[in-house]
Amino acid sequence: MEASATVERAAAKDVLTIREVLRETWHDTYASLLPETAIETITSQWHAPALLADQIQNPDIYFAIARDGGVVAGVVTARKEIDAIVVGRLYVRPHHQRRGIGRQLLESCYRAFRDAQKVRLTVEADNRKGVAFYTKQGFREVARSSEEIAGARLENVIMEKPL
């Protein structure tokens, strides 16, 4: 099913709803990959309302939401780094997935940084849905990395797509 969502820049009034979207999708995506305590620690730190509000206000960060039927269904953040768009986060609520909303959010990043030559992102290697989605969007693996977050070890795939 194709999306009927509208993508718009996030506003300060959206912070609590954005936090809810991020928490919901993090729990859905990572429940089988990370301990619950790690998910709670990460979501409380990375998705703190003050941090999200600062990112929304930062002119160097593209922060957008997708509304589907009036409901915030997805979130994307990106920034420009030399000739590349670096996607920091892209999450779509579980019951809104497979409708083209993720693609719409990605494409909005391309429009926000029209002079970029490529787009880069990092996805957890065991996040099969995420890796499959990005592969379908034309991304290819260019490197791997690992990191420890909240006591959990994550193996990451760094993916790029030429524009």
Regions found by a protein language model. Give the residues of each.
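Basic/polar N-terminal segments that are highly enriched at the extreme N-terminus
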Residues: M1-E2
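Conserved G/P- and acidic residue-centered "switch" motifs that form tight phosphate/ATP-binding loops
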Residues: G100
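Acetyl-CoA-dependent GNAT
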Residues: A5, R9-K13, R19-Q97, L106-A112, ...
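C-terminal "cap" of GNAT-fold acetyltransferases
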Residues: Q55, K118-V131, T135-L163
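Short, contiguous strand/loop micro-motifs
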Residues: I39, Q117-K118
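Residues forming the Rossmann-fold NAD(P)(H) cofactor-binding site
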Residues: R103
